[in-house]
C-alpha cells in the first residue's frame, strides 16, 4: 500500500515511475495561458500570509467552501485572512475525492516543503505560522515562487485596451529571468450583444485614437492595439466563447449598419450577432496568422448562472458551469472561413463539456497542414476537466484520434502563484498513462522512445509551438 502523496503519487507502475522521475520532473514550466495579475509580478508582491496567497480570487476553492456550508462572509466577505483560512481548513477534509484535496497538499509540499501533515483544523495553525515565515522571505515573493517552480514563461490574459505597462517593466528588468508575456483577449470587441459593448467601443476608440463609427474603424482600432501587443511580446490570443456563433459574413455596408444600430442602443437578433461575431473573429484570426500568433478558443462555459450572486460579487466568483449547446457545425465553418484563404493561425481548441472531446479531437484533423506539426491542437482538460479523469480522458482521446506526441501539454489557467503544482499533477497522470501502455504491451517499453515524447509534451512542444512565428 502506498502512502498518500508519496514520491510515486499517481504512478502505478515501474515504467511510469521512471518516465516521471527521469524525464518529466525536471522539465521547466511553459505556462502559456494563465490569469496571473502582471502588476503583482512587476511589483514582486510579498504576500502577507498563507490565506492571502491561497484564497484570493480562487473560485475553485470558493465553490468547495460553499458546498461545505461555509458562509459567504468567510469566503469573499469582510472576514480576516486568518478566519477565511481557518474556514478553508475546515473545508479541506471534506474534499476527499475532489482534486482540491490533492492540489492543497501538493501546494503545501511545493514550494513550502510541508510533507509531514495533512491539512485540517488541527494542523492549520502550525502550517499558518510555518508558511507565513517563508512568505516573508525573498524566495517566496511572486517572482521568487515562479523561479522556485522553474517557470520560464507565463502568458497572462489581457484586454486589448490594456497599457501593458507591467509587462514592459518586467521585460526591462534584467534581474528576473522569467518571461511574462501578454495574451490578447478580445471578447468584448466581437460580442456585440453585451450590455457594455457601446461603452467598450468608446474605450477602445480612445486608446487607439480612433472614433469607432463604422466597421472599418473598429478593425483599424483593433489593428493598432494588435501592433501594441505584438511589440510587447504577445504570441497568443484567447477567445472565451460561451456559444459558438457562425453566419456568412455580410457586406461591409451591412456590418456598418449593424454596428451603428447597436451603438445607438438597439438590440440585435441572434443572426445579426452571429454575423458580426463571425466577421470580427475571422478578421482577427487572419491577422493572428500574419503576426505568427497562436489563437486559443475556450468553448462552452455557461457563466454567471446565479443572478443574485452575480449582482453581489460580479463575474468569475464561482457561479459558472458546463454548457451543453452543440457547436460542431459552427466551429467547423468558423475555422474554414480562415482556412479557405490559408490564413488559419496555429489554433488550440478547448471544450468544457467532455461530451465534446471526440468531436474536438477529430475536428483538429480537418485543418492540419502547412508543414507545421500539430498546427491545430485539442487543448488540455480545461477548468472542470482539470482533474485526473478529465486530463486522462482528453489525452487518451487525443492519442486515439490524433497525435499525442505533438500535444502542447498543460497550462495552469489560474490566478494563483501556487498553482504551478498542477503541472506536476498533469505530468504524473501523463507518465502513468504512458507507463500503463508500456506495461500492457500496447507500446514498446523503450524509454529512449517514450522518454523524449514525455519531455516534449511537458515542455518542448509548447516552447516550439509558441515561439515559432512562421
From Swiss-Prot:
Protein name as catalogued: Uronate isomerase
Metabolic or biological pathway, per its Swiss-Prot or TrEMBL entry: Carbohydrate metabolism; pentose and glucuronate interconversion
Primary enzyme class: isomerase
Gene Ontology BP terms: D-galacturonate catabolic process; D-glucuronate catabolic process
Family that this chain belongs to: Belongs to the metallo-dependent hydrolases superfamily. Uronate isomerase family.
Alphabetical list of NCBIfam families matching this protein: PRK02925.1
Signal peptide: none
Native organism taxonomy: Bacteria, Pseudomonadati, Pseudomonadota, Gammaproteobacteria, Vibrionales
InterPro entries: Metal_Hydrolase, Uronate_isomerase
HAMAP family, alphabetized: UxaC
Substrates-to-products reaction catalysed: D-glucuronate = D-fructuronate; aldehydo-D-galacturonate = keto-D-tagaturonate
E.C. code: 5.3.1.12
GO terms of molecular function: glucuronate isomerase activity
Family matches, as PANTHER family: URONATE ISOMERASE
